[in-house]
């Protein structure tokens, strides 16, 4: 999965898909009442990027629905969306409410109330383990609204670079048993080692681990891309999807990796 980083403006959806992304990451900021408000990152952000691009969340999600509905030229090119949920602005007790409001919003504006809505898989990426009730609030709301089937399209990620054991315990608290992606990384302005990504991959490949897929961010340089692939990740989040595509075509990688398609299930652990 080639995950276009910080796609917060409607025009950028096309831009990143055209460069080779089959997945995008979008930042979601919340208002004081825990409603998803903007797709916005703000400063500081990755080196070389404009941190201030934004849309109203509803407008972005409607455009995303259009892009990921059969008949659209992007439909079979873009099939995974990571919502990077900026819950740091919320009180801990608002996490469940944020999940409820996010679910209602996506149900209406993305899934079109279950009537021929967008088809991409969605990952809810949460920066704080304490906010795990966002997941339970989200799940319960879709069930209450009569659309539990949409949870088949939803996965989860804790993005705070916490200890993998703590992450696993938090999923147990939330009652999550699958659809788990694990991120690891740091802004492209800095370097980060591979210790934790290796631990995440080990959990993914172990008999009793909860992780299904592992991705690393933000990977922009050619050598870092190679090092990341050598760590056996499932996804690379990048500002330059065309560089990831280029490296995947190198002799060392083209037989070992392939770019995911719409037919690939992002919740299934890949077994060699």
Swiss-Prot record:
Disulfide bridge map: 45-51, 47-189
Localisation: Secreted
UniProt cross-references to SUPFAM superfamilies, sorted A to Z: PLC-like phosphodiesterases
One cellular component (GO) term of this entry: extracellular region
Predominant subcellular localization, coarse grouping: secreted
Active-site residues, as the UniProt record annotates them: 5, 41
Protein name: Dermonecrotic toxin LvSicTox-alphaIC1bi
């Amino acid at each position: 999965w080639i995950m276009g980083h910080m796609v917060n403006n409607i025009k950028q959806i096309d831009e990143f898909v055209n460069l080779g992304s089959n997945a995008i990451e979008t930042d979601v900021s919340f208002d004081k009442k825990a409603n998803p408000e903007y797709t916005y990152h703000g400063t500081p952000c990755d080196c070389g990027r404009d941190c201030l691009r934004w849309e109203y969340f509803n407008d972005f999600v409607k455009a995303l629905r259009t892009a990921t509905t059969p008949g659209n030229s992007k439909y079979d090119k873009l099939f995974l969306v990571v919502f990077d949920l900026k819950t740091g602005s919320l009180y801990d007790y608002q996490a469940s409410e944020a999940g409820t409001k996010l679910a209602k919003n996506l149900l209406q504006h993305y899934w079109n109330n279950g009537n021929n809505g967008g088809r991409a898989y969605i990952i809810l990426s949460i920066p704080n383990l304490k906010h795990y009730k966002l997941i339970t609030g989200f799940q319960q709301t879709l069930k209450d609204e009569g659309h539990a089937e949409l949870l088949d399209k939803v996965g989860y990620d804790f993005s705070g670079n916490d200890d993998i054991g703590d992450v696993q315990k938090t999923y147990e608290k939330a009652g999550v048993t699958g659809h788990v992606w694990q991120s690891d990384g740091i802004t492209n302005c800095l370097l980060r080692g591979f210790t934790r990504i290796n631990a995440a991959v080990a959990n993914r490949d172990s008999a009793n681990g909860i992780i299904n897929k592992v991705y690393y961010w933000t990977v922009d340089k050619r050598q870092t891309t190679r090092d990341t692939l050598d760590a056996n990740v499932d996804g690379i989040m990048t500002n330059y999807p065309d560089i990831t595509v280029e490296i995947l075509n190198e002799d060392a990688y083209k037989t070992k990796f392939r770019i995911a398609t719409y037919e690939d299930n992002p919740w299934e652990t890949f077994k060699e």
